[in-house]
Swiss-Prot record:
Family, as annotated: Belongs to the dihydroorotate dehydrogenase family. Type 2 subfamily.
Known function: Catalyzes the conversion of dihydroorotate to orotate with quinone as electron acceptor.
Pathway(s) per entry: Pyrimidine metabolism; UMP biosynthesis via de novo pathway; orotate from (S)-dihydroorotate (quinone route): step 1/1
Protein name: Dihydroorotate dehydrogenase (quinone)
EC number, as in UniProt: 1.3.5.2
Recorded GO CC terms: cytoplasm; plasma membrane
Entry binding sites for FMN: A62, G63, L64, D65, K66, T86, N139, N172, K217, T245, G268, G297, Y318, T319
Annotated GO biological process: 'de novo' pyrimidine nucleobase biosynthetic process; 'de novo' UMP biosynthetic process
One function term, GO molecular function aspect: dihydroorotate dehydrogenase (quinone) activity
Reactions that this protein is recorded to catalyse: (S)-dihydroorotate + a quinone = orotate + a quinol
Keywords for the protein's UniProt record, in alphabetical order: Cell membrane, Flavoprotein, FMN, Membrane, Oxidoreductase, Pyrimidine biosynthesis
Gene coding for it: pyrD
Length: 336
């Protein structure tokens, strides 16, 4: 695979421009013979998590394919599952540009995208058109202009729209780029949101005749006590899984680098240890009552194994994939 040579050219251009061009290219080739440029076969490493049979434990994290436009293309690369979104009830432009910055010296990215997406109805149309038969996670969030006290209405709206199309649904309450979102991770706000989603899950299970698991995505910037409190809420409300973690607000590991002081969430190598620690603490607090999907700084099979040893059952990649491309998927799957 010739990704390193391609990356050299791509990295000469603005990060978001290249992202948009890549999405267009993958969308147009996902089900065509041209997917031979990135299609690859990986080893079967089947496992069952949240009652779902995964062909392998390596998934694409949310954020790369926000609108569900390239599902078949990512599947062709060997991912065991693909998570699309974050999607909101209404389309929104996100934050002002520039809003994504590469920090290659640290194998990192800082983004402050702000849930830019074309809205849940558009995502639904794309998922239907893809006719994808693999494992699809759909990550849902709230619109920026929705007051915090009404946040659960946004999550419920998205949940109802995507329920029949998703293999699992992720509730994103941990992006640092939507004001007030992370406050939903704590105490009564979290319990009220989870209780409402769980009640809706029961109604939708009856309506569609199938149970779609709910996972919650949390931040890496949590104390040990906060992790324990979140774990208790997840268990008490019967949530099916947890994704750990989102991007960090810390700038440890990028001090002095170009763009290192830009606002937004930091992902990639610098978040690896923070994420792994949260997974370890979560695993201890959850006591095998629900599974963890580990994400944050995975750039090799060793990194992935570190997450699994800390207590994760599955892993996801994003920033490592930007830097290494499809070969990373094969390297991780075959190296587990």
């Amino acid at each position: 695979m010739f990704y390193p040579a391609i990356r050299k050219v791509l990295f000469q251009f603005d990060a978001e421009t290249i992202h948009e061009l890549t999405i267009k290219g993958l969308k147009s080739t996902g089900k065509s013979p041209f997917n031979a440029f990135y299609k690859q076969t990986v080893q079967d490493k089947p496992l069952t998590v949240m009652g779902i049979n995964f062909p392998n434990p390596v998934g694409l994290a949310a954020g790369l394919d926000k609108n569900g436009e390239c599902i078949n293309a990512f599947d062709a690369m060997g991912f065991g599952f693909v998570e699309v979104g974050t999607v909101t009830p209404r389309p929104q432009p996100g934050n002002d540009k520039p809003r994504i910055f590469r920090l290659p010296e640290a194998n990192a990215v800082i983004n402050r995208m702000g849930f830019n997406n074309k809205g849940v109805d558009y995502l639904v149309s794309q998922v239907q058109a893809a006719n994808f038969k693999g494992i699809l996670g759909i990550n849902i969030g709230k619109n920026k202009d929705t007051p915090e006290e009404n946040a659960k209405d946004d999550y419920l709206h998205c949940m109802r729209k995507v329920y029949d199309l998703a293999t699992y649904i992720t509730v994103n309450i941990s992006s640092p780029n939507t004001p007030g979102l992370r406050s939903l991770q704590y105490g009564d706000a979290l319990n009220e949101l989870l209780a409402a989603l769980k009640a809706e899950q029961t109604i939708l299970t009856e309506k569609y005749g199938k149970y779609i698991p709910l996972a919650v995505k949390i931040a890496p910037d949590l104390t040990g006590d906060e992790v324990k409190s979140i774990a208790k809420s997840l268990i008490d409300n019967g949530i099916d899984g947890v994704i750990a973690t989102n991007t960090t607000l810390s700038r440890e590991g990028v001090e002095g680098l170009q763009f290192g002081t830009e606002q937004g969430g930091l992902s990639g190598q610098p978040v690896k240890e923070k994420s792994t620690l949260v997974i370890k603490l979560l695993s201890e607090a959850l006591n095998n009552k629900l599974p963890i999907i580990g994400v944050g700084g995975i750039a090799s099979s060793d990194d992935a194994n570190e997450k699994l040893e800390a207590g994760a059952s599955l892993v996801q990649v994003y920033t490592g994939f930007i830097y290494q491309g499809p070969p990373l998927v094969k390297e991780i799957v075959n190296g587990l």
